[in-house]
Amino acid sequence: MVSFGGIARKLFGSSNDRRVRSYQPNVTAINSIEEKTKALTDEQLAAKTVEFRALLAEGKTLDDILIPAFAVVREASRRVLGLRPFDVQLVGGMILHSNAIAEMKTGEGKTLVATLPVYLNALSGKGVHVVTVNDYLAQRDAATMGRVYGFLGMTTGVIVHGLSDEERHAAYACDITYATNNELGFDYLRDNMKYEKNQMVQRGHNFAIVDEVDSILVDEARTPLIISGPLDDRSELYNTIDAYIPLLVPSDYEIDEKQRSANFSEEGTEKLENLLRQAGLLKGNALYDIENVAIVHHVNNALKAHKLFQRDKDYIVRNDEVVIIDEFTGRMMPGRRYSEGQHQALEAKEKVQIQPENQTLASITFQNYFRMYDKLAGMTGTAQTEAEEFANIYNLDVIEVPTNLPIKRLDEDDEVYRTFDEKFKAIIEEILDAHKRGQPVLVGTTSIEKSELLAERLRKQGFDDFKVLNARYHEQEAYIVAQAGVPGAITIATNMAGRGTDIQLGGNLDMRIERELGEVEAGPERDARIQAIIEEIKELKQKALDAGGLYVIATERHESRRIDNQLRGRSGRQGDPGRSKFYLSLQDDLMRIFGSDRMDSMLTKLGLKEGEAIVHPWINKALERAQKKVEARNFDIRKNLLKYDDVLNDQRKVVFEQRLELMESTNISETVSDMRREVIEDMVEKHIPERAYAEQWDAAGLKTGALNILNLDLPVEDWVKEEGIGEDDIRERLTEAANAAFTEKAERFGDDIMHYVERSIVMQTLDHLWREHIVNLDHLRSVIGFRGYAQRDPLQEYKSEAFELFTALLNNLREAVTAQLMRVELVQQAPAEPEPPLMQAHHLDPTTGEDDFAPAIYQASEVIVSPENRNPDDPATWGKVGRNETCPCGSGKKYKHCHGAFEQV
């Protein structure tokens, strides 16, 4: 029976269809001026950029010039790249310009589509960021599409790992900047740890187009970017506790794979307590006593490392390091580390060198970073399954762009077997059968372990003509994937490895030319060889088409339908034929965790024999329902985490905005004076209770406070004894004494130095307290869930206590700044005797592994540090600097006239 909604959609079209049709008048208008645009010379076409900018300066909007701007980009693409955007690509460009996500199938030219809104929005002069998932794609797209932008008189920059601040600043200053999501986030955090505005590399967040938007804003949404500093070395403790886990038996612990949790049973707890007691590590009588919180954290991490984390699935060991594998792409994530000691527990398990734990200095999630942009858009081949999340969290609609040619791919029903062995046997038979026909095959697996197991079984069949693409061979990724469309090619790939690189039937022309003719100079010989490659690829493509196109075989379903759809989408690009099929077994993770027992009994009743498969649309629907449940649960988790992170994010905005104001100010004397006044008011309020008699005042406490905070030894006890003295009188005398002392000091320092000292101390103190605040919030968040047992809402409790902590931070800031400024003095520093250079090691961030130093409270050092090891933003890394040396901060002044002019005492 057809539903009313189905009838309505047939009559009026879906909301997606109506939205796409709404762009048709603009497409028609762009096509109507195509011939006129083609008639322009190269110089006239490039001059359009100046003309458009003049129109914007006169008050026109970007929407007003969209039609001629898109026409200009289309023509520039045709002349420079030999590629003319189709009408549906124009629609995709308009969707991106309208703050939405364009869902475009694989091979539909997302990279080219982006040039249209990128050029249009770059005309504003505020910069456009094009975000990719890795450095390779950022460099590739910037190099290719940068030719179009350059032809039209625009500049293109690219941000990749390892660039200097100067190079980053120049890249961000370009009209268009290509970068990875990680680099953008880290540059934002690093900028907000700088001490001079001219040292910041980013210039605002105007418009970002995120390629593979589902990967970055959904899969990576929960991943915080963290810049951190090292804590004390506790590697011995990790090794000691790691040795206990293999002594446990299954009854000593409980594992919940669905929730990814591991806990000790009563028997296991008793066994651990005995072991810890013997080692002298247990305080008190029981493991879960409050004084053993740190030990509990260690043993829980060790248990998870052994029982939840699987080598070659969750991580691999490479070059004596534990390297995380992205569960969605199967790619290695070198440098990225699990936080809160989990990575160290894995290092202990694998008997590799244990890296020190880290303390968070600055952090932000991708959810909050990308929500800072004034305008945000995205592209992907698979977004509809996450449309609700994009709408709720990012306020982004998902609009499906029609393909230029109809999709001819055949998506077959899943085949379900009883066991792994039966499934793998069927897969191998299917692979070899397709190979005999000359059909290219892409086999998708969910882990390195599975891909290598399949490869081994193929070799046992006497067949080794295939490529394995997983995290171990990341460097060859793009080329292997690009050649997966050659007739008879067999490519085994983990999940979505190679995403961003098209699989073209017959092979990738550009990559073959680069690989085979990279050293051949331009000329007749090169041209002839290029023509030969073109003819060869044309012939190979026809053979692949005759064999049925690319055949995608999936070895199991992923938790997310979107990942499965991405794998299917590698086949059938641009109207090519293709085929896809999923092979499953009841021993697969998804089937095992989400109720394969019922299905097993059902298959038994049906009389399913060994080696036989069941194929039915009902099976597909049942699996999709299981996947939807997992997706809904993961969305709820991300949504809930965002509510907590929003609390920190609001506070982060306040602190970072305050830092920016401080950096932009040359004189903050009024702010410092207000801080001092408020500190004095707090002191008086604390030691002189309201409506109390003079003899009830805490004169001794007030005197001590004045000495400790204001650095003033005042006769407070004598003042209290005066006849008729009041609270206001005490406050006024303290204020006058403090102001007089500070004014005298400012006159001795001179205005320039005093203003510099004030700003430096306020910023450094703010940074120090903010880092402590992040640690406090992390701790609060880790325990706040227990409030639920007392029938209290953990989120509301967290908001309330986080606000109290932030209020305390501001109070502590006022007090610490006042105390330091009342004590700071100019000193003459004599040159120190030379000492061995300090070897400054870069520390690894626990979640991202970025090399980062963090500014610290300035302290005098007696160690000589070689200039290349000094971080301009962190005085703590400078060591002893000669008075006549150039100041390491980068100001260009001599040290004695810059940072060396003052020292906190």
From Swiss-Prot:
Secretion signal, residue range per the UniProt entry: none
Binding site for Zn(2+): 887, 889, 898-899
EC number: 7.4.2.8
Cellular compartment(s): Cell inner membrane; Cytoplasm
Binding-site positions, ATP: 89, 107-111, 502
Chief localisation class: membrane
A Gene Ontology term for the protein's cellular component: cytosol
Reaction catalysis annotation: ATP + H2O + cellular proteinSide 1 = ADP + phosphate + cellular proteinSide 2
Example of a GO MF term: ATP binding
Cofactor binding note: May bind 1 zinc ion per subunit.
Listed InterPro entries: Helicase_ATP-bd, P-loop_NTPase, Rhodanese-like_dom, SEC_C_motif, SecA, SecA_CS, SecA_DEAD, SecA_motor_DEAD
Topological relation to the membrane, as annotated: Peripheral membrane protein
Family the entry assigns: Belongs to the SecA family.
Task performed by this protein: Part of the Sec protein translocase complex. Interacts with the SecYEG preprotein conducting channel. Has a central role in coupling the hydrolysis of ATP to the transfer of proteins into and across the cell membrane, serving both as a receptor for the preprotein-SecB complex and as an ATP-driven molecular motor driving the stepwise translocation of polypeptide chains across the membrane.
Name the UniProt record assigns to this protein: Protein translocase subunit SecA
